[in-house]
């Protein structure tokens, strides 16, 4: 019942977050016309240069693009979201057109990342199926730990790989054993040991002599990974690491030669012969620092497109293909560098509309610091 002395600082803070029920604004531009009193010529006002010609502003354009590229929504789902969450009614054609407009302004950012990739010491490359209408096409990707660049192409052959990587790559390219990469010089191509392990596991799970040699080859690959992990964690000196790797390489080749002759299945014999033929490509990491043993980086980056592909109906035009490869390049690069792709896209749209300096990746990173 006595007086209460209230402390200056609160003992508890309770915050409630909410979003506005009306989350959009409309700016109407009224254009007038008039007639010349002397020649009767009609003169019509035009929109200012810094006003979007379409019905969507920069924030809405960026939102629509991110719903596709980052959150893998189909056009129908985006249409439903705009209606349900914001009360905005746009046709599927208008949403598709908005994606095309975003794609057009992303060209400089996309080309900048693609050119930067050619200067990286080590890159990863992989491809996956892509659908355009009723045609089966391919989504290619080259990436590093900090960059990703996607490209759609009708071919899965060397022609497409050259378009993405260049005719004579000077960097080290980590790939699987696919023949489309055979044009790359053996000194600049590292085969993925995870793919090799997968193939050898299949051999070990077979029967007869297949199982015998497959089990031995799998054991050698696991020793390879253990040695690499110990070396990277500084538990093994460089000299001991190289000595053990050299012995392992000799044992690996001996077992492959035996398996290529004695496996009971021609399929596995040929697989072992192919590894013998490409033996130099398996060991490039020994002569170049920083070359990983696997192509897991590319497979992780491609997963974003695989998820998008599963939840949508593909594309039906060249414009749709360009949008996918460019928006995925922006989104995946931002993910790897912990940047906000929505903010970068807004900055690009704003700079394009106002004809100011275009923010490339390095410019946007500098602005975020």
Where are these predicted regions, by residue range?
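Short Cys/His-rich metal-coordination motifs, predominantly Zn2+-binding knuckles/fingers
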Residues: 1-3, 22, 37-41
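Short Cys/His-rich Zn2+-coordinating modules
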Residues: 12-24
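Short Cys/His-rich "knuckle" micro-motifs
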Residues: 2-11, 45-49
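Catalytic center-proximal scaffold of phosphoryl-transfer enzymes
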Residues: 28-35, 40-369
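Short linear motifs in intrinsically disordered/low-complexity regions
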Residues: 4, 8, 19, 355, ...
